[in-house]
Amino acid sequence: MASPIHATDDSATFQETDVISGNLLSNDSSDNGHLFLRAFDGASVGAKSGNSQVTEIQGDYGTFFVKPDGSYTYVLSDAAKIGFANGESFQEKVSYKISDGSGHTDVGLFTLNIQGVTQVKPIAVDDHYSFNEGDAIGGNVLDNDIAGDNGHLFLRQFDGTNVSAKSGPDAVTDIVGDYGVFHVKPNGEFTYELTDDLAAGQTVTETVQYYKISDGEGHTDAGVLTLNITGTDALV
């Protein structure tokens, strides 16, 4: 008797400068038409907040960000980016479990190949900031990044949204986060407007799963921005 659910193994190949993403469920099937990603590399994929909830899972050379709907992004670690030799390839192999929501499950294998590229490219180094509520929250995601051959760095995407540069380096793009709004510029500068009212001592974390930088000549890289904000007693 045929299984009511089937996971087909996945394989994807990207260059190290690509924004690495995809969906593991796109080639899978179930009799009832429902598919959910339940486990990835032995770790449960959280779904309490629905299909948009992100689970962060460490791989051998970077970090996977996966959702119950099967979508994923992958960000190379800084060590892997710097250690890539010309033409070298890294490979991540991960098992994953899917479900139809009715008790039927199956397991697939995901093989991710990442290829080194020849040009000297910009390298995006992950950013971590911590602020207290009431502080002027902001920074520049390009400050710790490494320029390529031409010495230029531009912010092109932020959390999946294109960063406008039509009005020059001071053009501002507004991007809504989980707890507030980012105001970002092509030169990497950002400010953050907290819209939630935090309790004293409460800490929330905004994670921008990737931002994409460019040298203006087609060479790109992606980094992660983590922003921690701690509530203060506004009545003091």
From Swiss-Prot:
Keywords: Calcium, Metal-binding, Plasmid, Secreted
Main location: secreted
Domain notes: Contains two Ra/cadherin-like domains composed mostly of beta-sheets joined by a linker region. Proper folding and stability are dependent on the binding of one calcium ion per protein molecule.
Pfam families: Cadherin_4
GO molecular function, one term: metal ion binding
Cellular localisation: Secreted
GO CC terms, sorted: extracellular region
Function: Interacts specifically in a calcium-dependent manner with the acidic exopolysaccharide (EPS) and capsular polysaccharide produced by R.leguminosarum. Could be involved in the development of the biofilm matrix made of EPS.
Protein name stated in the entry: Calcium-binding lectin RapA2
